[in-house]
């Protein structure tokens, strides 16, 4: 039986994820923590406690109880934080990182002290930055294990798989559509060629890729720019954590996509840190399933690499105290087919 802690459980994503985690028999204790005064995590826990499953619920409100929430946890989910409406590009992701970095750093330092053996799953946006912040904070603390730190990329893989299956009529439960490289709008690379019967015309692949990359922005606009897709994000995040628990408790379990430090960068297109399908076992990440790419996907990956490196470097700099500089190869933080209103002025200034 496992002890699972959810940091940020009072947020929209945290509440949805906690609802699904409460239903898992493998969890002995589900510890819900939040330090935001407006997030009534005790009320969330009391509500979930009415669900007649075997998992026990504990609630911790306030920073003074972070130690108790994390003590001897087997899995820690760091979620929640601020979101920019609508999500757009790396320029806004950098701003968002400054809002959320303290939440992630404080949680990571506490994990290093009170549950250094735990697997950390980072969902707080932007995941690319916060994964690096978490990993390098643990390195500074001397307890880093690359097998036990991952960035949650489940929402992007789930969206890509749903799009693919809605067109082909395939069963989503029997099909996987990997999303590699990173987790952000400018860094996610859906690999439709790896899915079964994925022989689409290039124009359709372009459209599907754009839908995956702009999914956050689309759903935000549908909701009148008031919120993101918390239900789908919470569900996919919970599914990722459940698969981690199955790997710990039952044996090797497949996860459709997670941002991790690769075992051999040479086998992952020269990228030491990359989101790929992985296998999780009793000691954490045990295997990396790097998909083969077609020419379009290879070009998209090359275009996305410097964006991912920039985001990872931003997180690293604030973990170790280095000064951050924008990646020298970056000209516009947006994806290639449509620069956004945020970045267009910056691009014009550079051309002068």
State each model region's role.
Residues 140-148, 153-345, 352:
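C-terminal substrate-binding/catalytic lobe of Rossmann-fold NAD(P)-dependent dehydrogenases
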Residues 10:
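Conserved glycine-rich cofactor-binding loop
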Residues 14-15:
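N-terminal Rossmann-fold NAD(P) dinucleotide-binding loop
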């Amino acid at each position: 039986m496992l002890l699972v802690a959810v940091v940020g459980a009072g947020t929209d994503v945290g509440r949805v994820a906690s609802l699904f985690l409460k239903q898992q028999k493998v969890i002995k204790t589900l510890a819900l923590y939040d330090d935001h005064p407006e997030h009534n995590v005790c009320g969330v826990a009391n509500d979930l406690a009415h669900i007649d499953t075997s998992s026990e619920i504990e609630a911790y409100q306030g920073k003074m109880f972070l130690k108790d929430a994390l003590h001897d946890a087997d899995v820690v989910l760091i979620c929640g934080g601020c979101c920019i409406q609508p999500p757009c590009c790396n320029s806004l992701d950098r701003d968002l990182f400054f809002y959320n970095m303290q939440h992630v750093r404080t949680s990571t330092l506490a994990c290093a002290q009170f549950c250094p053996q735990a697997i950390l799953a980072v969902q707080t946006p932007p995941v690319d930055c916060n994964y690096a912040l978490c990993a390098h904070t643990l390195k500074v603390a001397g307890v880093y294990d690359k097998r036990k730190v991952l960035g949650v990329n489940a929402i992007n893989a789930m969206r890509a798989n749903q799009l693919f299956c809605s067109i082909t009529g395939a069963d989503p439960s029997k099909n996987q559509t990997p999303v590699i490289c990173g987790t952000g709008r400018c860094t996610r690379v859906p690999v439709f060629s790896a899915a079964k019967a994925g022989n689409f015309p290039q124009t359709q692949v372009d459209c599907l890729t754009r839908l995956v990359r702009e999914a956050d922005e689309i759903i935000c606009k549908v909701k009148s720019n008031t919120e993101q897709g918390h239900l789908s994000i919470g569900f996919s995040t919970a599914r990722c954590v459940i698969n981690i628990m199955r790997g710990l408790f039952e044996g090797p379990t497949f996860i459709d996509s997670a941002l991790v430090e690769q075992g051999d960068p040479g086998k992952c297109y020269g990228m030491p840190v990359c989101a790929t399908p992985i296998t999780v076992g009793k000691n954490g990440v045990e295997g990396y399933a790097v998909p083969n790419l077609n020419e379009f996907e290879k070009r998209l990956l090359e275009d996305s690499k410097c964006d991912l490196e920039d985001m990872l470097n931003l997180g690293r700099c604030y973990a170790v105290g280095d000064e951050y500089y924008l990646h020298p190869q970056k000209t516009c933080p947006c994806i290639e087919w449509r620069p956004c209103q945020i970045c267009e002025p910056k691009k014009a200034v550079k051309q002068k």
